[in-house]
Amino acid sequence: MKTKIINLVVVTGMSGAGKTVAIQSFEDIGYFTIDNIPPSLVPKVIELLKHSEETDKIALVVDMRSRVFFDEINDILDQLESNEELNFKILFLDATDGELVSRYKETRRSHPLAADGRVLDGIKLERELLSPLKSLSQNVVDTTKLTPRQLRKAISEQFSSKQDQSSFRIEVLSFGFKYGLPLDADLVFDVRFLPNPYYDPTLRNLTGLDKEVYDFVMTHKESEDFYKNLNHLIKPILPGYQKEGKSVLTIAVGCTGGQHRSVAFAHRLAQDLKNDWTVNETHRDKDRRKETVNRS
């Protein structure tokens, strides 16, 4: 039986340097993540993951919030280094003292090591305590001049495999305006101006996924013209969203009830985009009218 290799990244560094953004970034590229874990629990988590089929990638934040446990860190790191079933790296996030002070002032949070409330004293003590760990780190990132978006991009580029690059996902969603706009939509397109199959009794109880309705909607000249323009708008901008570090882009297409026109349009768009992107297709309100009729 082939031995399972776990890819482990221990995220550590100065408080305020961006560890929260970092751990969210690892989650976006498919890592199992745990924040603020006591070092003594790291081997136990790895042992559990060895017997799981869910993932072989894990990112853990270990920092001075767990100071009571932090004395164990060197022994734990030695164990990890000697484990042949681990591909193990340390990511250390740093920033200048001035930048860290500025971030603490902005958030109005107290430093975990500033007993008397003086942020700079806490930073200096933390820097001293973390110095040995920083020297062991294979990856040291200075976030002083990085925006959260730039940090996410840096982590994605450094720790994503080629397969992970497909972590950018497009959600194509149809909906009915009468039931409200999707709250998570990034782009919304309105197709209520197109001829409505609802007024044809033979099509009323069907949906945009049925061939009769799909053909009715998509064979009108207005539909063809609009779909062509929609493609010309959407396809060129997708690489830009991916480049900016967005993990999910939701494209919503709406008609009145979300049963006919929007379903047909969203389905065609999703099928076309699947040629080049990872796409999920959802029809939020497709069966809502049927369910309402059945309840009555």
Swiss-Prot record:
ATP binds at residues 13-20. Keywords: ATP-binding, GTP-binding, Nucleotide-binding. GO terms for molecular function: ATP binding; GTP binding. GTP binds at residues 63-66. Belongs to the RapZ-like family. Displays ATPase and GTPase activities. This is Nucleotide-binding protein stu0831. It comes from Streptococcus thermophilus (strain ATCC BAA-250 / LMG 18311).
